UniProtKB/Swiss-Prot annotation:
Subunit structure: Component of the SCF(CCNF) complex.
Organism classification: Eukaryota, Metazoa, Chordata, Craniata, Vertebrata
Task performed by this protein: Substrate recognition component of a SCF (SKP1-CUL1-F-box protein) E3 ubiquitin-protein ligase complex which mediates the ubiquitination and subsequent proteasomal degradation of target proteins. The SCF(CCNF) E3 ubiquitin-protein ligase complex is an integral component of the ubiquitin proteasome system (UPS) and links proteasome degradation to the cell cycle. Mediates the substrate recognition and the proteasomal degradation of various target proteins during G2 phase involved in the regulation of cell cycle progression and in the maintenance of genome stability.
Feature: compositional bias, Polar residues: 702-722
SMART domains the record matches: CYCLIN (SM00385), Cyclin_C (SM01332), FBOX (SM00256)
Protein name (record): Cyclin-F
Gene: ccnf
Residues covered by the Cyclin N-terminal domain: 307-404
UniProt motif Nuclear localization signal 1: location: 19-27
InterPro entries: Cyclin (IPR039361), Cyclin-like_dom (IPR013763), Cyclin-like_sf (IPR036915), Cyclin_C-dom (IPR004367), Cyclin_N (IPR006671), Cyclins_cyclin-box (IPR048258), F-box-like_dom_sf (IPR036047), F-box_dom (IPR001810)
Motif segment (D box 1): 309-312
Family: Belongs to the cyclin family. Cyclin AB subfamily.
BP GO terms, sorted: cell division; G1/S transition of mitotic cell cycle; negative regulation of centrosome duplication; protein ubiquitination; SCF-dependent proteasomal ubiquitin-dependent protein catabolic process
Amino acid sequence: MKAGALHCRCAKCFSLPVRKRVRKRASAVSLLSLPEELLVFVLQCLSAEDLLSVRAVHSHLCDIIDTNASIWARVSFKDRWPAPDTVWLFERAAEKGNFEAAVKLGIAYLYNEGPLLSEEGRADLCGRMASRYLSLSESLRSPQAEPFIWLFIRPPWSVSGSCCKAVVFDRLQAECQTSPGRKGTLLYCLARVLQLFDDEEKRDEAELMLKESSRCGSLQSSYLLWAISRASSTADPGRYLQCMRTLRDYAARGCWEAQLAFVKSCGSANPLGLEPRACSELVSQFFQTGPSALRYQPHLQGQDITTKRYILVDWLVEVTTTKDFSSQVLHVTISCVDRYLHLRSVPKAQLQLLGIACMVICTRFISKEILTIREAVWLTDNTYQYEDLVHMMGEVISVLDGKIRTPTVLDYGEVLLSLLPVERRTAHLFSYICELSLLCSPATVPGPARLASAILLLTRALHNYVPVWPVQLEENTGFSKQDLVSCALTLYIKCFGQDVPKDYRHVSLTGVKQRFEDDSYQQISKDTVMGFKELCHVLEVPEVEPQVEVSSTSGQITEMHTFLSSPTSSSKRRRADSMQAHRGAFVATPTAELSNQEETLLGDFLDWSLDTSCSGYEGDRESEGEKDGEISTMEVQMELPLDCADRQTHCCLLSSDDTSLCEEDEQEPPTGGSKPWTRHLSSSSTSSSSSSCGFCTDRHSSGYSSIQSFPSPTGSSALVSPQNPPGVPSQRIRRQVKRKNTAAHSAGEAEQEDDAANLAFLSF
């Protein structure tokens, strides 16, 4: 083709150059390319197992993990417990400042529920290791935080053989001489232990320890000394004035118990001679700076968890009534449960384990009479093993950062009733509504300060007090009547205007109502409550139709049965068949934790012995009341053996065994998305043993069972019910069926926020 000549655009004489695709080079940015500060932040969010896996990926990651103590201090040990092959990991994290690892190691060594130790010197070795890590865990907390490790070594102690509690006590006492920085906290813990003994000499020694601890800067010890000397200073006006000034100083320094005592004194009188307006501002500030309402994890929200929580609280109320614990123990227990669920998700099938573990902890922290671990397991119909409860106690303490006691509705209620006293029957109604409010989900009620004020407003309205919300209450709380009316009406609807939830047997859960039918509360729950329209008229608000929530239980009946039904003895993990059967030679102290009450009532039905029972110590086996012979009356009911022709049908109808569930799944396809939960509490082997099962019926009990069934060589079952109050014979045949012992994997954990800010207090 000549230059400049035209040509056609056919494919033969004209073609476009082929465009080549230029492949972009892959970016070389990876995890290793991130700045070290960002890498450290990412690694801090991993679990212990994931951290070890990442450590083995690259030498750079290995160096970062090994050289940064902050990573080990924040690594998570969620649902993990020290074992012989992982104890080194817990120890390394604890030495780097990991509170969770230190707490779990201390509890594991104390109860010998972790590393297997040699038989020689078992009590001394367990005690030394437990004291080391319990002391370490206490040192990792804020100096202003109230110490907690004393509740694990509090009496009763073992009266025969070596006691691990006594070893820990002696080791902590020796550490006071070698560690001056921890002396104040450790002396406070030792003094709290000695105060619980009946010996007068030990109580005098405890007071000397408190004085030494106060000189070392312990604010809690100073407040306890003030409480001891308060009674002797009331007679002299000058000494009483100085006493109240000292209390004001402790309150200004952040001691919450001192703040509560000071506010109550300001409400009932004016001990410092302040202006009335100044006293009102102090009390108002106490209410306005109270803790806010809690919210559960997104995984644990909805009608399902609300109903299950209602059943749990109702069952805990029954346990509190049966064991004659105070209402404060119940409120603090529910507070621990809600705060745990606020910070960490838990399988719904483990709610009962969480609840009873919180009650075991709170009784040791608040009450003189404790709920022993052995008895707590028995109250759950042996659905959980001894070690399961010990592990959950470690989880609760670590998640709550050792902060057990927080302000409750009862605390603010005491202040309100001191501001404006009411009649005794009105005070009982106030307490009744306070416990009914525990049944409400935390997402539907405000914080304890506003909630207590709303309950008092509702109480005064129901008993026709005029004015229903005086100016004195408004000035001292900072809440006007308009601020509280909405909450008061909501409480009325939830407590009195709705049908109470029912379990899968369609039995109403009325544990709180039965509790306040007692004569000690003047049978306040039997009173007729005024109607909603009349209440609106008393509160001077427009009459509106109450929005009553109707819970649809038809779609939850199958899942509710799985949640409540108790496993039969063929699927229940038996202690004698587990790997713990031969541990009698390795426990630190005697293993029996059975109270005298249980021994007297059960007799030969109990098939456990010192050789086959789980770990623990005899010093944890009975409360002070049981040692004094205060034995509650329980009824043992025998059920006649069934005929062979009817036995199979009877067991198929009443059993919640895994085999029965599998047979139902083969016959009917799964519907409604309800799936049986799988258990992952521990790695203990599950044993199966065949025995007959018998059940009793109680139309007024909670959905949880407090029944323990024991195998009988004759084929019948001996059922023991702790639900009857002492001295009251049973009127009905009891049937208490508990949920199945299964669990689902947790859906995740929200990062724990630091809520250690003290309440602000005015200083004069």
